[in-house]
Amino acid sequence: MLNVLMLGVGQCGNRILDAVNRQAFGGSRLAKYYSKQRFPSRVETIAINTAINDLKELKFTAAKDRLHVPNLHGVGANRSKGKQGFWENQEMILEEIEKRGDFDLIFVMTSVSGGTGSSFSPLMIHELKKRYKNATIVPIAVLPFREEGTIYLQNAAFCLREMIEVEADGMILVDNQYLKRFSGDIASAYDRINTMVAQRLLFLIEALDSEMLSVTDLGDFKTVMNGGLRMGTLGYYQADKKSPSIRAAIKNSLREVGLLYPANVDAGEAGRAMIVIQGSREYLNVDEITKEIESLTETIGHVFKGIVIKKGEPRVLSVLSLERAPGLVELYEKAKWAIQEERERKDRARSELYEAFEQINDLEEIY
């Protein structure tokens, strides 16, 4: 049995964790008080935040699984303030995590653009790696809508770089900007994106801890996530009775519409993959699955496959590591502009203010 820890850090991470618990508890707001989570593994969940109101809004996460970092009321998207808050409270945070026991797999779910999540997460991963030396630690990094503002863009750029520098075991990217086009307005986009992430993570956890006809395990997952850029994404597709073709289901799980971050597999943007196929035995033709997996190796360097017999139409989860990420290059170009824009605005405002002050340089107060 796998021991899994899921940390939701900051508002975005908290909401993804709440979506995980909603699906794990079965969707009832009251279920968290009397039901057991529907995990095959031992899974611990903790929502961490500096803003207590963000924790209060969670509907499916039990009170014991909410950790408020005291003496802070959010950090106002200021990563410097957030880092200071983490260092001042790190022992309290890590002690709460260590109470939950040992873990084989740790997910750190966060927005890379806000305040608490983007400042806490790289530092937390660094500390967790020292304390859980044998655990696989993977951040779920949510990229911002590009129109959210200059501060969020610069936060995203620095947080992503720091997550790579602390040497997490790969990183799963989720791109709000990309996924928004499937969800309409921003409010409904947030809910849909959180649900999509939760669905894929729960499928992954279940697959890693299931008896399989063809086996993939945590070691395979780690190998995939450490490939290429050490950044990856998750894809998903569920077939129906009208079109239960297993080969089509595998293909569709790799199409951009099913991915959390856009990757053109046919153009060689994926370096490694783990494909997990689940469904009733009648749909799972091993020869057809093998042929499709072999065809994928023409564009993907190495593909692990797992087959899980479970009643229902085929469902496919794809885990991809990225060889190229043009969208990230574009994000960093925008972040560079955002940083320069912020600096110029500050300099301009200060210059205007000092010019105003100069008008009274030769004057004294008169009463």
Swiss-Prot record:
<dbReference type="GO" id="GO:0005525">
    <property type="term" value="F:GTP binding"/>
</dbReference>
<keyword id="KW-0133">Cell shape</keyword>
<comment type="similarity">
    <text>Belongs to the CetZ family.</text>
</comment>
<protein>
    <recommendedName>
        <fullName>Tubulin-like protein CetZ</fullName>
    </recommendedName>
</protein>
<dbReference type="InterPro" id="IPR032907">
    <property type="entry name" value="CetZ"/>
</dbReference>
<dbReference type="GO" id="GO:0051301">
    <property type="term" value="P:cell division"/>
</dbReference>
<dbReference type="InterPro" id="IPR036525">
    <property type="entry name" value="Tubulin/FtsZ_GTPase_sf"/>
</dbReference>
<feature type="binding site">
    <location>
        <position position="148"/>
    </location>
    <ligand>
        <name>GTP</name>
    </ligand>
</feature>
<feature type="binding site">
    <location>
        <position position="194"/>
    </location>
    <ligand>
        <name>GTP</name>
    </ligand>
</feature>
<feature type="binding site">
    <location>
        <begin position="115"/>
        <end position="117"/>
    </location>
    <ligand>
        <name>GTP</name>
    </ligand>
</feature>
<dbReference type="InterPro" id="IPR045061">
    <property type="entry name" value="FtsZ/CetZ"/>
</dbReference>
<dbReference type="GO" id="GO:0008360">
    <property type="term" value="P:regulation of cell shape"/>
</dbReference>
<dbReference type="InterPro" id="IPR003008">
    <property type="entry name" value="Tubulin_FtsZ_GTPase"/>
</dbReference>
<feature type="binding site">
    <location>
        <position position="111"/>
    </location>
    <ligand>
        <name>GTP</name>
    </ligand>
</feature>
<feature type="binding site">
    <location>
        <begin position="11"/>
        <end position="15"/>
    </location>
    <ligand>
        <name>GTP</name>
    </ligand>
</feature>
<keyword id="KW-0963">Cytoplasm</keyword>
<feature type="binding site">
    <location>
        <position position="176"/>
    </location>
    <ligand>
        <name>GTP</name>
    </ligand>
</feature>
<dbReference type="GO" id="GO:0003924">
    <property type="term" value="F:GTPase activity"/>
</dbReference>
<comment type="function">
    <text>Involved in cell shape control.</text>
</comment>
<keyword id="KW-0547">Nucleotide-binding</keyword>
<dbReference type="Pfam" id="PF00091">
    <property type="entry name" value="Tubulin"/>
</dbReference>
<dbReference type="GO" id="GO:0005737">
    <property type="term" value="C:cytoplasm"/>
</dbReference>
<keyword id="KW-0342">GTP-binding</keyword>
<dbReference type="GO" id="GO:0032153">
    <property type="term" value="C:cell division site"/>
</dbReference>
